[in-house]
Amino acid sequence: MAARCSIAFMIMASCLSVVVSGGLPGDLFALSVASKLRVDRNSTARASSDFGRIVAAAPEAVLHPATPAEIAELVRFSASSPSPFPVAPRGQGHSARGQSLAPGGVVVDMRALASRRGRVNVSAGAAPYVDAGGEQLWADVLRATLEHGLAPRVWTDYLRITVAGTLSNAGIGGQAFRHGPQIANVLELDVITGTGDMVTCSRDKDSDLFFAVLGGLGQFGIITRARIGLMPAPKRVRWVRLAYSDVATFTKDQELLISKRASEAGFDYVEGQVQLNRTLTEGPKSTPFFSSSDIGRLAGLASKSVSGVIYVIEGTMYYNESTSTTMDQKLESILGQLSFEEGFVFTKDVRYVQFLDRVREEERVLRSIGMWDVPHPWLNLFVPRSRILDFDAGVFKGVFAGANPVGVILMYPMNTNMWDDCMMAVASDDDVFYAVGLLRSAAVIGDVERLEKENEAVLAFCHNEDIGCKQYLPYYTSQDGWQRHFGAKWSRVADLKAKYDPHRILSPGQRIFSSPASMVVVSM
């Protein structure tokens, strides 16, 4: 274990960049929230990096608020100061490129709010909903809603991340083809703007702020509460994985499963994975779904393919005791419409909670072998359906030809009409688009540089071939890049930034607008 820790530290030290910045205004420490500010090295160090472990940026202080009002006081002070400083809310720090960091400013430890009781409240009426603090983990929201036999409709694959964190991006998962992203299921928000105002907003009240904050990358306000619609929670899940050796057949079947015709009585969740080379033998070991013999069979299927690439559809059907007798019949009806490789059907029957929290077990496995706290140079893209086969040929069978990635590659479709274009999240012009997640980890020294070069090659391919990709959990180093990303929404982004965060205080780690803090970047 000591050796693994040493290796992890060397990897991190070899790839991080550090931001050195000036101090905070002295009268900040005369505020009533001063007792909640920590400036010691241990506190600032913990808030200096994120899950990606690619970037490090030291804040001057960390705020551990007891109430949202204390966050608002901090933001108001910065906004009214002759020397405004950056403020960044941080939940679990699950960003990959320093988006949750505040170089030269103050990081707000949102999880500190979770120590107060009553931050998750369920209303189980005719139109049920949950009021959840922005700092709450989705796992905690699930636990609270299940006590009432209810649950949110859409889930990210990993539940140990915060409500505000996912809603600031979009929040996608295998249920999004039916219900849209998580932001499409929000009814109301409490937001602290960049001027320190505390605003309750919805589609009908202060709607410009409501739509700006959902998918707004933290640029317009800090979400402290979200009201999220609920549905009756099922008890059990029939969990299915189907293997393919042909990408055209794989995508055709995925698109059938998310179509209106199939989805009315079909899968409740649809995702997919691309397995190539090392991911066939290493990736499945971190999940309890496949047995050793299953993995061997999948590797054998890949060996028969010229490219060495295979594809896996992952789907689920929810059910309760009252519908269990018809489950097998419904599943057989769906499978009869699909063209997966004969004999490559893998099924499990699990509790609803066990399925939703499935990545938790994978996390435990990866932590046990020292592969969780390593750099994650992830790249997530939305690829138009019209170009997904070109993307497959150019990336999986081009850029990644001969590669041996450690991690997971996701690829699954969503329906564009389930996304609200009033919100700031950017999807696709096609009626169907694919979420492609290159969720790879740097296992040894030197991997970060290699993986980053491959990411650059992927982006270059998409640009040169005019694939029309959009980044999800985006990262750009110039405002030109951000303008291209937002496209027609850019003017609205700029106008709303000027309205709700005129001093460009909030979430500087996104690098969309210049930060009020001066920064010097040096290599470690």
UniProtKB/Swiss-Prot annotation:
Glycosylation sites per record: N42, N121, N277, N320
A GO cellular component annotation in the UniProt record: extracellular region
Required cofactor names: FAD
The protein's Enzyme Commission number: 1.5.99.12
Domain FAD-binding PCMH-type: 55-233
Subcellular location per the Swiss-Prot or TrEMBL entry: Secreted, Extracellular space
GO molecular function: cytokinin dehydrogenase activity; FAD binding; oxidoreductase activity
InterPro entries named among the record's database cross-references: Cytok_DH_C_sf, Cytokinin_DH_FAD/cytokin-bd, FAD-bd_PCMH, FAD-bd_PCMH-like_sf, FAD-bd_PCMH_sub1, FAD-bd_PCMH_sub2, FAD-linked_Oxase-like_C, FAD-linked_Oxidoreductases_BP
GO BP, sorted A to Z: cytokinin metabolic process
List of residues binding FAD: G91, G93, S95, Q99, D157, T162, S168, I172, I223, Y472, S507, Q510
Pros-8alpha-FAD histidine modified-residue sites: H94
Catalysed conversion reaction: N(6)-dimethylallyladenine + A + H2O = 3-methyl-2-butenal + adenine + AH2
Subunit and partners: Monomer.
Similarity annotation: Belongs to the oxygen-dependent FAD-linked oxidoreductase family.
Protein name: Cytokinin dehydrogenase 7
Gene: CKX7
